[in-house]
Amino acid sequence: MMESEVDSERTMLKREIAELRAALNQKEQCLRELDSLFSFATRPEQEVVGNDLESPDVAVHTKLTNDDIARYSRQLILPDFGVQGQLKLKNSSVLIVGLGGLGCPAAQYLAAAGCGHLGLVDYDEVERSNFHRQILHSEDRCGMSKAESARIALLELNPHCEIQCHSRMLYPHNAMHIIRGYDVVLDCTDNVPTRYLLSDACVMLSKPLVSGSALKMDGQLTVYNYANGPCYRCIFPVPPPPEAVTNCGDGGVLGAVTGTIGAMQALEAIKVIVGMGDVLAGRLLIFDGGSGVFRNIRIRSKRPNCHMCSAQPLITELINYEMFCGMHATDKNNPMLLLSTDERLSVEDYQQKIQAQPHLLIDVRPTAEFEICQLPEAVNVPLVEILDDSYLKRLGKQLEDKELPIVLVCRRGNDSQIAVQHLRNRFPTHFVRDLIGGLHAWTNSVDPSFPIY
């Protein structure tokens, strides 16, 4: 057998082993979730509730201490707040779901204001890409649970605040137990399935839900399920198509925008707890960070035939929200599978077999991302230009060569698959492939010095 054939066989076997391992990991994760769901359904309720699922034990305080008076003096002198407002806050419990760009400032201001008990829900770990907006985390806590990292920072700010960490994802089988013991819930997540899950659970448990979102330079804020106001399903009875949803990991966000919305989520929670001001129920606050303009608009009232919060709801228990929305309940990379493996290239195959030969390498990321980092000889043609064929004039001569391999790359190997499908329809006789895993795979498998963002 020739050396080249041996190399090809070894590469193919490595690829098959990697695919089998990935499939095994996926099956094992599914089995763990099924085991968890089965054990939850068959065990008595008191056994199901573990340490981080138990309702917070909030002591009832009837007066302020000298430390309270000194610490909170600037808000105690507010006529609409006063001693009674501070006591309500001290006796309250707030659940913050998501300790990211929104949850960090929200938790910080609630702890600083004297909220008696905070629950922190986040399954994720701290990483460097968090620091520009997730202000409770620090360099020395990289790899730590975000909930635990936030707890450390909050206790440094206010050691009198009781903090309970729920370092797990919310699922239909655990959400009710976690949420039940809190007075107010803050939705600081970045995905649609969790928004539906939180809204439905809060309706069932009669909890106000303070919902915030931020993307690029814009932010939004409202309060659901409060004072006979609408729930999330009243406004969005049908989830958006998955391809229309962008999170901050893909679309980007300015840290000060998440800070603005997160701080205002804390403000709305305080207003709900204390009973002061005009709560943003039935209204949507829209923040345009580019112009510095806040707008306040009316949203539709409670829907009489809402499947969740109407007098005769069709939904009486929590459902599979990932299936309902057609997307994952996480902002982590969820690889698309538009092409089969043999229609694509691993980064190792590209480096060994194609990179040194004449070929056309097209990077389909937006120009702003291309400027951050790029592979040698890559040509930037954003996906939108691929789809509208505006790239044809730029690359016409190269595309006329049917023998010239065309390789497409993006950040994670998702958009490049869409581009491959489009180019194959346009140039059916050309060799067109994309890089599996994109630039992230290049860093992980070929060049560790190549930056990840």
Curated annotation (Swiss-Prot):
Q: Which residues carry this modification: Phosphothreonine?
A: T62
Tell me the leader sequence span. Answer: none
Q: In which pathway does it act?
A: tRNA modification; 5-methoxycarbonylmethyl-2-thiouridine-tRNA biosynthesis; Cofactor biosynthesis; molybdopterin biosynthesis
Keyword match Metal-binding? yes
Cofactor mode of binding and number, as noted: Binds 1 zinc ion per subunit.
Main EC class the enzyme belongs to: transferase
Q: What are the recorded Gene Ontology BP terms?
A: Mo-molybdopterin cofactor biosynthetic process; molybdopterin cofactor biosynthetic process; protein urmylation; tRNA thio-modification; tRNA wobble position uridine thiolation
Per UniProt, subcellular location reads as: Cytoplasm, Cytosol
Protein origin, superkingdom: Eukaryota
Protein name per the record: Adenylyltransferase and sulfurtransferase MOCS3
Name of the gene encoding the protein in the UniProt record: Mocs3
